[in-house]
From Swiss-Prot:
GO molecular function, one term: aminoacyl-tRNA deacylase activity
Domain of life: Bacteria
Reactions this protein catalyses: tRNA(Leu) + L-leucine + ATP = L-leucyl-tRNA(Leu) + AMP + diphosphate
Keyword terms: Aminoacyl-tRNA synthetase, ATP-binding, Cytoplasm, Ligase, Nucleotide-binding, Protein biosynthesis
Top enzyme category: ligase
GO CC annotation, single: cytosol
Main location: cytoplasm
Annotated residues for binding of ATP: K641
'HIGH' region (motif): residue ranges: 40-51
Name of the protein described by the UniProt record: Leucine--tRNA ligase
Organism: Leptospira biflexa serovar Patoc (strain Patoc 1 / ATCC 23582 / Paris)
């Protein structure tokens, strides 16, 4: 008879719910352990079998930690704002709030059916006003702050205002403030509200900017670069066009975001992805003079040592000087090219393997190191306006993209680094020296990369045409979306154009109910249609303003949810400071590698601002990060409806039980690797759990049976090895080998007629993190009246981990030729004698002169022979 998993699982899930077994006492005196999953977006499709993989892993860890005496915080919630729900509402007429609630109910039911030990009292949803009140509150904390360069941290904007009132713009002109914006303290005081706000916008960590964005007309919204591929693959077209958008000044934190990665125990690949995304480089900003305009083009280069190899300049199509540079003959071609580029995202434009395109402007610049040399000026989509200065000096001999472009447009290729050039390939080297690189202005020939770099910096700065600069690839965060289903931005615009941040007492700014979710057609979000909601009357002055109609991106709610879990029902503060100090940082964070950059970078950014402002006590939110591998279809392809290879966890739970699904997903292979689904594998794990059940039930009636007998040494060894390996493997996320060890245990005891309770009872505890329903049932049958959830994990005795016999390797002249078993305490003389009895080794030494016999205690014998 198979074990009755349906009855057992329903029974224990009801028990856990009724007794609130997994409720966290945040004020407990126990040591703390915060185990966090990346919370899911509750789609209409419900869970797929990929979701339980990560959730089961964190559940196993949480259950073990409770048994080890920790107070465990293990919560679950929903990242529920976003474009898919809004699109569904547009096609069905069903309000996103309704579909989101239904989807959450489905996800919650499915997750509960897996026996996951979440504290459901802490459940949150990013779409609930009680939650997004704090999203808006954090937004205002960021908006009302600026980055103080001297302190290298965020500071309230009121501090800056006091400085401007006292000292004017003395310390900021040319850095935060553009050159030419100068004023005294008295001049500041005389400025209008709008003028002051325009100046403050250069400092605030949230600001408005007119930038080229990815605009999707059909969706009626801006898409972030990372979203473009997703929606174009669904048939939507995207174009680039300038729009006024809210930005978050994440670039101010680039250095700290980079340096503090050293505090993170994260996968090396994820750390590297974040480093590359931040993209720190050291280079030279250098001006190229354009005689026809009597203006300069400033380029940024990380290789100023190659200046003499620059044979042309390339500007981004959006560069401000393009119109002035373009000659009448080239105007039509340049205009058409700019239009074509506006239809491409940054990701499309920078693909390394794509065909290079561009147009000559008709203008030339002078090479700074030799003004007699004229270099043509092109525009091309492989140069982005958002990086550096939006202009590059092209050195085709030593940069592959420049080389490909030069070949296509028949431009000169001049080698200036010593080395061998190969056909169709540029080459780069920082280990060689400069050649063909001297003029009356500057001499680089024979200099190393480092010396030539420094020579160029000194020369350019002395000439007043350049400066050394640290540059980052990281761009400020585009924070506005022209959508309905998102957090309203708590700002108001008055008629004079000046903004006002809502006060804390005016939060939450609740999303109004709308019947129409289609794009407004004006570039504004559907909130522009909420006429009554739009009108704002200042409670202090009575002044009438208009609410901001953009909403926040989906990333906003996930930037801090780990904090709200700690204190989810606090209506007065984001989080109680004492609880924050007790529970942060998160000990282990588990989720997909697809979030390696954006969510993790944005949440780190928000956390650092909250840290600077004194709201949190740790510089980083997540101590250890682990990514689960994908679960593929049985065809080894990614699961998708179109492939027809999606497996619904409800079906597996219905046929085999939740414990089977949990155990199988942990047994499939290494946790962090991708693995194909296997129906046969599920069957195998189900058979294993039935064997566990039958081990405790015997006779014709399969009645429960264990014996109060003393275990023998062999039984003790099997047990103690199992409980140690299971514990160690859980700690190292090696769940598959932990399951293998439990299978070894069952194999050995299935063939053993003895059923010693002293061995079987600890095994149930070791099994419980993986198969909690079955373990709870067996625990109760063993005579216990309480749940095993908080029972101490069994301890192992080292003496049972030591084998009486060991394997000793036999070498001849250092090469392995055989091995033999021997007592652990074997003496050298006996070991040498037994080594000579190993038949496999004899052909390599018998009949030869033995020069030496070496014994390495407990490991090997090496017979050294002549010849």
């Amino acid at each position: 008879m198979n074990y009755p998993f349906q009855d057992i699982e329903q029974k224990w899930q009801k028990y856990w719910d009724h007794h609130q077994t997994f409720r966290t006492n945040t004020h407990s005196s126990k040591p703390k352990y915060y185990c966090l999953d990346m919370f899911p977006y509750p789609s209409g499709a419900g869970l797929h079998v990929g979701h339980p993989e990560g959730y089961t892993a964190t559940d196993i860890i949480s259950r073990l930690k409770r048994m080890e005496g920790y107070e465990v915080l293990h919560p679950m919630g929903w990242d529920a704002f976003g474009l898919p729900a809004e699109r569904y509402a547009m096609t069905t007429g069903i309000h996103p709030r309704t579909t989101t609630k239904n989807n959450i109910d489905t996800f919650r039911r499915q997750i509960k059916s897996l026996g996951l030990s979440y504290d459901w009292e802490r459940e949150i949803s990013t779409t609930h006003p009680d939650y997004y009140r704090w999203t808006q509150w954090i937004f205002l904390q960021i908006y009302n702050s600026y980055f103080d360069r001297k302190q290298n941290k965020a500071v309230p904007i009121t501090t800056l205002i006091q400085t401007l009132e006292r000292e004017g713009s003395l310390f900021f002109e040319g850095v935060e403030l553009p050159k030419g914006i100068q004023f005294t303290a008295s001049e500041w005081k005389s400025k209008s509200r709008k003028e002051k706000e325009d100046i403050l916008s250069h400092f605030r960590l949230v600001y408005e900017a007119n930038i080229p964005v990815n605009w999707c007309e059909a969706l009626g919204t801006v898409l972030a670069n990372e979203e473009v591929e997703e929606w174009t693959s669904k048939g939507y077209s995207v174009e680039r066009k300038p729009m006024r958008q809210y930005m978050m000044r994440i670039t101010a934190y680039a250095e700290r975001l980079l340096n503090d990665l050293s505090l993170c125990e994260w996968p090396p690949s994820t750390l590297e992805m974040q480093r590359n995304w931040i993209g720190k480089s050291e280079g030279l900003e250098l001006s190229f003079h354009v005689p026809s305009l009597n203006k300069d083009i400033t380029v940024y280069t990380t290789r100023p040592d190659t200046i003499f190899g620059a044979t042309y300049l390339v500007l981004a199509p959006e560069h401000a000087l393009v119109a002035e540079l373009t000659t009448p003959e080239q105007t039509e071609a340049v205009g058409q090219y700019q239009k074509d580029c506006s239809l491409k995202s940054d990701l499309e434009r920078t693909e390394l393997n794509k065909d290079k395109t561009g147009v000559f402007t008709g203008a030339y610049a002078q090479l700074p190191t030799d003004p007699s040399v004229k270099v043509p000026i092109y525009i091309s989509d492989y140069v982005l306006i958002s990086y550096g200065t939006g202009a590059i000096m092209a050195v085709p001999a030593h940069d592959q993209r420049d080389y490909d472009f030069a070949v296509k447009f028949n431009l000169p290729i001049k080698q200036v680094i010593d080395g061998k050039m190969e056909t169709n390939l540029a080459f780069d080297s920082k280990d060689s020296v400069c050649i063909n690189s001297s003029s009356a202005e500057v001499q680089l020939d024979g200099k190393s990369y480092k010396d030539a770099f420094q020579t160029m910096v000194v020369w350019a700065e002395k000439k007043g045409i350049g400066r050394k600069k640290i540059q980052f690839k990281l761009r400020d965060w585009l924070f506005a979306r022209q959508r309905y289903w998102g957090e309203p931005i708590p700002l108001v615009h008055f008629e004079d154009g000046s903004p006002k941040a809502l006060s804390d007492s005016e939060l939450p700014l609740v999303l109004p109910d709308l019947e129409e979710f289609k794009p407004s057609g004006t570039g504004e979000s559907p909130l522009a249609l909420a006429k009554d909601w739009l009108v704002y009357k200042d409670p202090e002055t009575g002044e009438i303003g208009k609410r901001e109609t953009n909403t926040m991106p989906q990333w906003a709610g996930s930037c801090y949810y780990y904090l709200r879990y700690i204190d989810p029902r606090n209506n007065d503060k984001l989080i109680d400071p004492e609880l924050e100090k007790m529970w942060m940082p998160v000990e282990v964070y588990v989720g997909g590698a697809e979030h390696a950059v954006l969510h993790l970078l944005y949440s780190r950014f928000w956390h650092k601002i909250l840290f600077d402002l004194g709201h949190v006590s740790t510089p980083e939110p997540f101590k250890k990060l682990v990514h689960q591998g994908l679960i593929l279809g049985e065809d080894k392809g990614k699961m998708s409806k179109s492939r027809g290879n999606v497996v619904n966890p409800d079906d597996v739970v219905s046929e085999f039980g939740a414990d089977t699904l949990r155990l199988f997903e942990m047994f499939m292979g290494p946790f962090e690797m991708s693995k194909p689904w296997s129906k046969n594998g599920v069957d195998g794990v189900f058979r294993f759990l039935n064997r566990v059940w039958r081990l405790f039930h015997s006779g014709e009636n399969e009645s429960f049976f264990v014996e109060d007998i003393e275990p023998n040494e062999a039984e003790q060894k099997t047990l103690h090895r199992t409980i140690k390996k299971v514990k160690d493997d859980i700690d190292s996320f090696s769940f598959n080998t932990a399951v293998s060890q439990m299978m070894i245990f069952i194999n050995e005891f299935t063939s053993n007629p003895r059923k010693p309770k002293q061995v079987l009872e600890p095994f149930v505890l070791a099994l419980s993190p993986f198969a909690p329903h079955l373990a709870e049932e067996l625990w109760a049958k063993l005579g216990h009246t309480d749940s095993l959830a908080y029972h101490p994990y069994p301890k192992w005795d080292e003496k049972y981990l030591i084998d009486a016999n060991i394997t000793i390797v036999v070498q001849v002249n250092g090469k392995m030729r055989g091995e033999f078993l021997a007592p652990r305490e074997i003496e050298e003389k006996e070991a040498l004698s037994l080594a000579k009895e190993v038949e496999k080794a004899k052909p390599f030494w018998v009949g030869k002169e033995i020069k030496k016999e070496i014994y390495v205690k407990g490991k090997l014998v090496n017979i050294v022979v002549a010849g």
